[in-house]
Amino acid sequence: MRLTNLLLYILLSINLSVAAVATEKYSSLNHSLIYSYEEMFNFDIEAYLANQAPHLLPYAEVISHWSGYSSISPRVLLALIEQQSGLLTQQQVAAAVLETPFGKLSDKRGFAEQFQDVADKLANLVYTQSKQEGIAEFTGQIDPRLSGLDILFTADNTQAGWTELEIQQLEADKVAFTELYYRLFRQEYLPFKRQPDDKEMQVQAPNGFLQFPFPLGQSWHIGGAHTNTGSGSYPLSSLDMSMGGGWGSNQYNTWVSASAAGQFKRHSSCFAEIVHANGWSTTYYHLMNIQHSTGATVNKNSRVANPANTRGQALCNGGQSTGPHQHWSLKRNGSWYHLNGAYLSGWRITAIGYSYDTNCNRFYLSKNGWWGCAGYYRH
């Protein structure tokens, strides 16, 4: 069975266009794939592992970090581990199994490496991308025999079609996964449900709702918009911001601030999220000295953390970084949100290019008749 097939049974009953995932034109989450805010605050990963799989407790932060970073449900990922290797319920675990918890779903070695890889693959299957006349938009390649699916079918670049046997096997995998998910978490696995289509413009947070994620009165450098992973061109949900300085520099007087008031989620020692009103949230990555615990209420402009001043801390669970900065992202109902048209501290963002594109025709900020490209900005 192709690697894509092995992952697709998680997505088999998706009945919405991929674009709807990005723009979030529906009012509530009624599915299990995306890491919802309800799950974020009501499913305690560490407590679950302590009760059900204590041998995996050393990996609690890895699970929390990459679930938060990919915005894929940790329950889905844990169920995948159990389906592929039985690692959650094994009483005695061989070292080789800990190295390959997802089995053939990943060709990486190591628990953290496979967890990150599979979380990223699932996210990429949701956020399928294409370019049309230089503007990124979601697309779906639909096999008519797979009713209602909008999924990328060509991850292994071998064949776009499906045989009847493959479709039957995928349906069996779906049933098996659904039963396993219920057995592990005592709740149903709920696929995406299509909501009434809204062809109007994207819902936007009102001007004034979000501020730059640094203290009022300060000026930070802002680079080109990019996807959360840093590759591709949609959704351009993220910005890198910094006050300068290299590894080892003093960052203890440099503060990352909350873009709006909300409830705090500490995903790991270097990654946090604040859930705001009306389905919005903002994430903050490459941090040290995080000031709050999960569940805390924070105010707009309040201190979140310092930019990490060592590469090891900035990448506390892996990834890439070239120096102290914060990686800031916007989400809507748990999904990464395209920044084009969004406002930060009254500045309207235009982002119609690709990741890290600093061409002034494709990425710029404008406010009260002023506009600028990548560079230093203040509130």
Could you say what each language-model-derived stretch is?
Residues 64, 68-88, 118:
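Short, functionally critical alpha-helical segments immediately adjacent to catalytic or ligand/cofactor-binding
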Residues 222, 256, 262-264, 295-308:
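A structural signal for short beta-strand/turn segments enriched in small hydrophobics and glycine
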Residues 202-205, 209, 220-258:
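Short glycine/threonine/proline-enriched tight-turn/helix- or strand-capping micro-motif at secondary-structure
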Residues 206-210, 250, 299, 320-379:
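Acidic, glycine-rich catalytic/binding loops that coordinate metals and/or anionic ligands
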Residues 19-62:
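N-terminal export signals and maturation junctions of secreted/periplasmic proteins
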Residues 20-28, 105-223, 356-379:
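Non-catalytic cell-wall polysaccharide-engagement segments
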Residues 250-291, 310-325:
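Zn2+-dependent peptidoglycan hydrolase active-site motif and core
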Residues 5-15:
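Bacterial N-terminal signal peptides
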